[in-house]
Amino acid sequence: MGNELRHRTVLLDEAVESLVTRPDGVCVDGTFGRGGHSRAVLARLASAGRLIAFDKDPRAIETAQGIEDARFSIVHDSFASMRDALAARGVEKVSGVLLDLGVSSPQVDDPARGFSFRADGPLDMRMDPTRGESAAEWLARASVQELTEVIRDYGEERFAFQIAKALVARRAESDRLGPLDTTGELAQIVGHVVKTREKGKDPATRTFQAIRIHVNQELADLQVVLDAALSLLEQGGRLVVISFHSLEDRIVKRFMQAHASAPAVDRRLPIRAVDLPSPPLKIISRQFPSEAEVAANPRARSAVMRIAERVTP
């Protein structure tokens, strides 16, 4: 069975129902993946509707090119390029933006992509293997301080400093052992350092997450695309974001809350509340996968979906 067939889209019906409020509108799928959300969006759009999808992964682009629908187009780039990419296509406003964050099952399950500590493979971790610096290349040059900061901040790993020192010590042995360039060896190094075990988690989980986030600039791109989505959404348009770990969800939560609240004003100033600008967003809901979905797809367990609506022009 192919990777595409093994991928299960999380919160499929809930996300699409929240996103498509105007069937003749322009929707954006910021993370095409293997097309689960995009195909469901197309099924809900009217003939005058339009869907523009983004993805960095060349394999996702290949899958997207198999969709023969005049309403659909795919952009081979990060969703961080959304504002410019839509402007180049003459799109000024959209009725919905969907972001399904993180890695897809086919990416994790393919050892050649270097995302997983469960199977040995090249230490790559790039969403787009044709662009940028691989995990192995970064590990070959990063200082103890940089390694510590990335593993601590992006992996929330309390043994970050010890892991960083072990990685630099391994690098010093490169002349004798060769470069650190496989996921198996990275997982082994981390496992030797992290002696405690979180229930249901491999000791390398946090470090792999941190390196992947750094290599792909995931959190920086998320900040950029949230700002872009806010400016692109028409009045009544929806922003729907599915995240899978606390770092992403925290950014999304704070963004939505900040733009759904009236600006703070010193109460000593003679400004009436009615004279303040209205916040551009209204928070609609926060949703989680059902027990049935988690039972069928355990990877959905950590998912949280946040929905906000643009309420000002």
UniProtKB/Swiss-Prot annotation:
List the Pfam families.
Answer: Methyltransf_5 (PF01795)
Catalyzed reactions: cytidine(1402) in 16S rRNA + S-adenosyl-L-methionine = N(4)-methylcytidine(1402) in 16S rRNA + S-adenosyl-L-homocysteine + H(+)
What is any one of the record's Gene Ontology cellular component terms?
Answer: cytoplasm
Which residues take part in binding S-adenosyl-L-methionine?
Answer: 35-37, 55, 79, 100, 107
Superkingdom classification of source: Bacteria
Q: What class of enzyme is it?
A: transferase
User: What cystine pairs are annotated?
Assistant: none
Localisation: Cytoplasm
The record's InterPro entries line, in alphabetical order, gives: RsmH, SAM-dep_MeTrfase_MraW_recog, SAM-dependent_MTases_sf
| Family matches, as NCBIfam families | 16S rRNA (cytosine(1402)-N(4))-methyltransferase RsmH
Q: HAMAP family attached here?
A: 16SrRNA_methyltr_H
Name of the featured protein: Ribosomal RNA small subunit methyltransferase H
- To which species is this protein native? Burkholderia orbicola (strain AU 1054)
Upper taxonomic classification of the species? Bacteria, Pseudomonadati, Pseudomonadota, Betaproteobacteria, Burkholderiales
GN (gene name): rsmH
